[in-house]
Regions:
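Substrate-recognition/specificity elements adjacent to catalytic centers across diverse enzyme folds
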Residues: 22-155
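Bacterial Sec-dependent N-terminal signal peptides
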Residues: 1-21
C-alpha cells in the first residue's frame, strides 16, 4: 500500500510539473507603466503568459536576438550580421547546448518549453510579424543558444 501511495504522489508531482497549458487560465494585466503582471494557476502558464507579453512588447527584437544566437541573423540583415553568426559558430553553441541539455533540471526545461509555447503561439496568431520562418518553432535549445551567445559577449 505504501508503494502505491508513493507512486501516486510521484505521479501527481510529475503531472503538475508537466501540466498542459490552458491560455484561458492566463491573465495579463498591465499597470499604468505598461508593465505586464501575469496571473495563472501554474508556473508553466505564467511562463507562457510572460512570453506572450514579451512578444506583444517587442517581438521583432526577440526574433533578432534568437536569430543571432542560432547563427541565422545574416539571413535577416545580411553581411552586417557576419560577426554574430561567426561568434555563434566559434563558441560552438549548438554542440554545447546539445551536449549539456540533459543536465538541466526537469522543472527548468518545462518552464522553457512553456515559454517557447507562448512565443510560438504568438507567432502563429501574428504570422505577418514573423521575420524568418526557419526560426520557428522556437525551442528551448534555441533559447539556450542565444543565452550562451549573450554570456560569451558580456564576459
Amino acid at each position: 500500500m505504501k508503494k502505491v501511495i508513493l507512486i501516486l504522489f510521484i505521479l501527481s508531482i510529475h503531472l503538475n510539473i508537466y501540466s498542459q497549458i490552458n491560455p484561458d487560465n492566463i491573465e495579463i494585466v498591465r499597470d499604468h507603466y505598461g508593465v505586464p503582471h501575469i496571473y495563472a494557476d501554474t508556473d508553466s502558464e505564467v511562463a507562457y503568459g510572460y512570453a506572450w507579453a514579451q512578444a506583444e512588447d517587442h517581438f521583432k527584437l526577440i526574433q533578432e536576438a534568437y536569430l543571432a544566437g542560432n547563427g541565422m541573423l545574416g539571413k535577416r540583415i545580411g553581411l552586417k550580421a557576419a560577426g554574430a553568426d561567426f561568434l555563434t559558430q566559434f563558441i560552438q553553441s549548438e554542440s554545447t547546448v546539445n551536449d549539456l541539455y540533459h543536465t538541466l533540471d526537469a522543472k527548468f526545461i518545462s518552464l522553457l518549453e512553456a515559454f517557447t509555447e507562448g512565443l510560438n503561439a504568438f507567432a502563429k496568431k501574428h504570422p505577418d510579424e514573423v521575420l524568418e520562418k526557419k526560426l520557428f518553432p522556437i525551442t528551448p535549445k534555441k533559447i539556450l543558444r542565444y543565452t550562451q551567445l549573450q554570456l560569451f559577449i558580456s564576459n
